[in-house]
Every structure is written in structure tokens, then in C-alpha cells.
Amino acid sequence: MSSRRSSRSRQSGSSRISDDQISDLVSKLQHLIPELRRRRSDKVSASKVLQETCNYIRNLHREVDDLSDRLSELLASTDDNSAEAAIIRSLLNY
Amino acid sequence: MASADKLINTYVPEKDVFALHFLQSLSNLRTQNPLNSPDKSIDRVRKIKKAAYVSMARAAGGTSRLWSRALLRRAAKDDNKSVRFSRRKRKVTWKISSKRKRSNQRAPVVEEAAERLRNLVPGGGGMETSKLMEETAHYIKCLSMQVKVMQCLVDGLSPK
């Protein structure tokens, strides 16, 4: 282990992360992703976790897009469908 | 093992911090453009989307996270402004030379997936794989927080 560490620390001043910490990070990511949280077994490979992470991030981006769209529509509309909506709109200067 | 004792911090503020930043951002949008409402709905949507990302980056810690710094830098470049960063004690490399990245190879199949992740996380291109994963975890938490805030707002504004 120490020989591995010394060969890596040659490159830069920043501290090297061990492979243990990598797998720790991978399992942390696994807990964050709803898809993978259900299968609590440790049998999910690191690359699978990263792959699902990519998909999850893309989904989140898409949700932000969609919600921005709806917000824009709702804020621009002038029908006061509810008192709450009117309050929110006036708060935001619309 | 001393050098590997870096604490991995994925603390994310409460939802109301994100909500506050986003609401402020949204109300600022209107005060910038009081009399002439942007005609094109696409412009409106784009501005709201940008407000969402910028307010998220600010709520999540502004310049203390690599992904939020990259996001804010990108947004400022759009507006032709410059972002002031406080001097960090650690040397920040804007470009990671390919030699350094290569020397940090994990299993190639992991690196391949990490490459795709780098394209999705702001600022990911210059990050070492382990740092990338730490930043990703934080980014995901903040993104889902932001989505919740926006969903609440949409629910509040929607017809009952």
C-alpha cells in the first residue's frame, strides 16, 4: 500500500485519495441515486453507479428545464387562479 | 494513511436557503425589466432557468465548491462580467494537463464512465476522478433541492 502511495504522491502536492476512499465515494453516490438505493446490496459495480449517476443528473437537468418552462408560463399568466398564486406573483413583481 | 485523511464533506444547506435565493433571483428578473416585458417566451424561460442555476450555485456555497464556481463563472461570462474569487490557499489549476489525469487512472471502465460524468458536472473537466465524485455527490444533492423548490413554486402558482 505504501509503495503505491509514494509512487502517486510524486505527481502533485495535493493529498492522494486511496482506493478505499474511492469505493466509499461510490457507495455514497449509490445512496443518493433513487434507482440504486432500492438495491441495497453492495453488488453494484462502480461503473454502474457512475452510469446511473449520469442518467440521474440528466433527468434532473430535464426537470429543471421543464419546471422553468412551467414557471415562465404561470408567472406570465394574468388569471388569478387562487389567492396564493396572486400573492406569489405580486411578491415576485409580476 | 495520513495523507488520505481528507474529510469528504457533502453538507448541503436547508431547502429554505435555496428557496430564498431563488425567489430573490426571480424578483430581480422583473426589476431589471420593468416596463418592457420580454416578448419571446423562450427568453423568459431562459432567464428563469439561468436564475435557477445561479441561485442554486449561490445557495450551495458560492465559490467554495468547484462546480458552483464553474457555474457562476460560466454565467458571468454570458453577461460579460467577471466573477471575483477569493484567493484560495490551495493551488487551483484551471487546466489539468492530460499527463496528470492519465497518471490518476482507476480501472479503465470506471474512467470511461467518469468521462461522461465530467461532461455533466460543471467544472468537471479539470477534476481528478475522486474529486469529481465528491463534487458530483454535492451537485446532485443541490440539484434535487433546487428541483423541489421549483416544484413547490409551480404548485403554489397552479390553479387549484
UniProtKB/Swiss-Prot annotation, chain A:
Pfam families: bHLH_ILI. One of its GO terms (biological process) is regulation of DNA-templated transcription. Disulfide bonds: none annotated. InterPro entries: bHLH_dom, HLH_DNA-bd_sf, PRE. One of its GO terms (molecular function) is protein dimerization activity. Keywords: Cytoplasm, Growth regulation, Nucleus, Transcription, Transcription regulation. Induction: Circadian regulation with a peak of expression at midday. PROSITE patterns: BHLH. It comes from the Eukaryota. The keyword Nucleus applies. CDD domains: bHLH_AtPRE_like (cd11442). Residues 6-60 form the bHLH domain. GO terms for cellular component: cytoplasm; nucleus. Belongs to the bHLH protein family. Interacts with HFR1. Atypical and probable non DNA-binding bHLH transcription factor that regulates light-mediated responses in day light conditions by binding and inhibiting the activity of the bHLH transcription factor HFR1, a critical regulator of light signaling and shade avoidance. Forms non-functional heterodimers with HFR1, causing liberation and activation of PIF4 from the transcriptionally inactive HFR1-PIF4 complex. This is Transcription factor PRE6. It comes from Arabidopsis thaliana (Mouse-ear cress). The lineage of its organism: Eukaryota, Viridiplantae, Streptophyta, Embryophyta, Tracheophyta.
